[in-house]
Amino acid sequence: MTISRFYRILLALCGLVGVSIQIHDDGWGMLLYYTVLSNILVFSSLIFFIIYDFKKGDATTNTKLLRYKGGVTMAILITGVIYHILLAPITEPEKFWTLRNFLVHYIVPWGLVLDTLIFDAKKAFRLREPLYWSLFPLSYFAFAL
């Protein structure tokens, strides 16, 4: 097993555990939150990439998959950055220092960024793709209003 596969399996498990704890503790209504949706997007995408790796070869060289992963990375990075800047300072300490909080707001977002920077092929993106990647966050923003 390659290091990238092992890393993605660990990261997918972190996302799955974090989302599972949130849903267990706070109910199915958590599925309406951007944090949970973006973490589900991450772990389901990572599971797909892992299966792709086993069946067809290295997913990190497939430019279509990397472009999709760029969008997933942008979506989860928004989760991490917005939480850290806007919400973490006002979160009560007993809610901040929990496993689920660190999994969904820090470990999975920054873990996927590291995965992208370390394992993915370089220069796989086109200049206009960040515009496409912003569709998921903007759609959620419209939904939230």
What role is predicted for each listed range?
Residues M1-L145:
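Aromatic-rich, lipid-facing transmembrane alpha helices and their immediate juxtamembrane interface loops
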